[in-house]
């Protein structure tokens, strides 16, 4: 039996693009952003943070200002866009940690550079991902938090001491834990275990069926607990498109029929093709989350991280229903 949910949809803190529009591309336009965002809002996502990845300052400035102008043109859309997530440029440039980001555009943590980015975002920067082990990361974290920006650790090679130092400086989350790190790490001193062990940090993770296997998702559920978990998509520009070959985040990418989005040459994932609705159904299929747990992971916890009242999230064209045997669906 289907039950209509009281939430307007899910909240996604990491959306890099949708239906062919890349928020970090030099080809981004106001019209393109509006089209991508409005389309995403029809797929079960009620609110999200447009996410820009590591890039040179000129392009970050350009694209932040394009999105700001787009939101001033579209008052309806502006209510669903909760601000920006900057996933870089203050990350690690080391292989494995840098992922699909451009290592040449990585910057050392800098309060001055952060202030420029925040200005270009029209004060709408809500989440910042930084490498916990980078010199100056703790100073930047304190500064960002003082400006009302949540800080998340990610794309790094941090150990337990680094992660604890960032938590002490005010960081409150981990960006897509289990990804953005080398395939092979020290069995004890590694970003994955360091992040899980730090109880002060929420765990952002990508349950799209490709970034993390089922047994790892279950480990996260049991080790972190639902109060710390935040599902995100890490959706790339190929999300919402049919299988094929695409340019994604500056990478040649293949979108397989099963939804896996990857670069065959680098042998790495280049974001996700999933929506929050699809990710939440992956979690439901694990059988270890109650409906209340799922709603916390996909709606309440992300809003708590960025300090947004759930009552502020407006309704969408489609509501969400839930059935124990079928999971979530659009109404």
Specify the residue positions occupied by each region the protein language model found.
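Active-site-adjacent C-terminal substructures of enzyme catalytic domains
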Residues: 162-293, 308-309, 325-326
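Divalent metal-dependent hydrolysis catalytic cores, especially in the metallo-beta-lactamase
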Residues: 16-24, 34-63, 79-92, 121-133, ...
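Short, well-structured alpha-helical segments that form the helix of a local strand-helix-strand
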Residues: 291-302
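Metal-dependent catalytic neighborhoods of phosphoester/phosphodiester hydrolases
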Residues: 58-69, 97
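Divalent metal-binding pocket/active-site signature
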Residues: 86, 93-190
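Residue-level marker for buried hydrophobic side chains located in beta-strands
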Residues: 9-11, 152, 173, 231-232
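Histidine-rich, glycine-flanked metal-binding segment
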Residues: 1-7
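C-terminal cap of metal-dependent C-N hydrolases
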Residues: 304, 308-331
């Amino acid at each position: 039996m289907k039950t209509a949910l009281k939430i307007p949809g899910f909240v996604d803190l990491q959306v890099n693009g949708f239906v062919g529009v890349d928020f970090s591309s030099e080809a981004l336009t106001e019209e393109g952003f509006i089209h991508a965002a409005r389309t995403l809002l029809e797929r079960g996502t009620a609110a999200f943070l447009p996410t820009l990845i590591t890039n040179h300052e000129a392009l970050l400035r350009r694209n932040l200002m394009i999105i700001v102008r787009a939101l001033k043109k579209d008052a309806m859309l502006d209510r669903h866009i909760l601000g920006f997530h900057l996933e870089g440029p203050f990350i690690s440039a080391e292989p494995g940690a840098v992922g699909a980001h451009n290592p040449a555009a990585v910057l050392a943590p800098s309060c001055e550079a952060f202030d420029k980015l925040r200005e270009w975002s029209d004060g709408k920067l809500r989440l910042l991902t930084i490498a916990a082990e980078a010199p100056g990361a703790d100073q930047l974290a304190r500064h960002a938090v003082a400006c009302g920006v949540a800080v998340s650790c990610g794309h790094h090679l941090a150990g337990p001491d680094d992660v604890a130092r960032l938590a002490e400086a005010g960081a409150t989350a981990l960006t897509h834990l289990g990804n953005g790190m080398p395939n092979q790490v020290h069995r004890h001193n590694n970003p994955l275990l360091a992040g899980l062990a730090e109880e002060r940090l929420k765990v952002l993770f990508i349950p799209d069926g490709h970034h993390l296997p089922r047994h790892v998702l279950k480990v996260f559920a049991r080790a972190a607990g639902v109060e710390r978990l935040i599902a995100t998509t890490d959706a790339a520009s190929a999300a919402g498109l049919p299988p094929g070959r695409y340019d994604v985040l500056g990478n040649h990418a293949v979108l397989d029929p099963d939804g896996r989005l990857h670069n065959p040459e680098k042998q790495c994932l280049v974001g996700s093709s999933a929506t929050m609705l699809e990710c939440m159904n992956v979690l439901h299929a694990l059988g270890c989350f109650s409906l209340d747990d799922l709603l916390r992971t996909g709606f309440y916890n992300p809003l708590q991280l960025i300090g947004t009242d759930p009552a502020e999230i407006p309704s969408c064209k489609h509501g969400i229903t839930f059935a124990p045997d079928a999971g979530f669906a659009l109404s």
